[in-house]
C-alpha cells in the first residue's frame, strides 16, 4: 500500500467513524465516548499525514507511534460502545476491523522504520 493510499484510507476511516458517531450520539450515555472516538479517529489520519512529511527518520517514527496509539484508542472506544450498546455490534464491527487493519499496517511500518534506522547506525 502506498503512502497516498493509506492517507485516503485513514481519511475514510475518520469519515466512517464520524458517520457512526452521528447515529449513536443521541444516546446520552455514549456522547462522551462518541466525542472521544471522533477525536482519536481524526487524529489517526492527521498524524499519518504528518508522519509522511517528517523531517527525519526519528520524527517519522515518533509520529507513527502517535498514529498507533490513536488507532488503538479508537479500538478501545469501539469495544466500549459495543459493550454498552450491544445492538450497535453490526455497525461497530466493520469500523473496528478497519481500525485493526490500519493498526497492523502502522505497526509493521514502525518495525520497518526502526530496522532501517538501526541499519544506518551499523
Residue spans for each PLM region:
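Short, C-terminally biased terminal segments at protein or domain edges
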Residues: 1-122
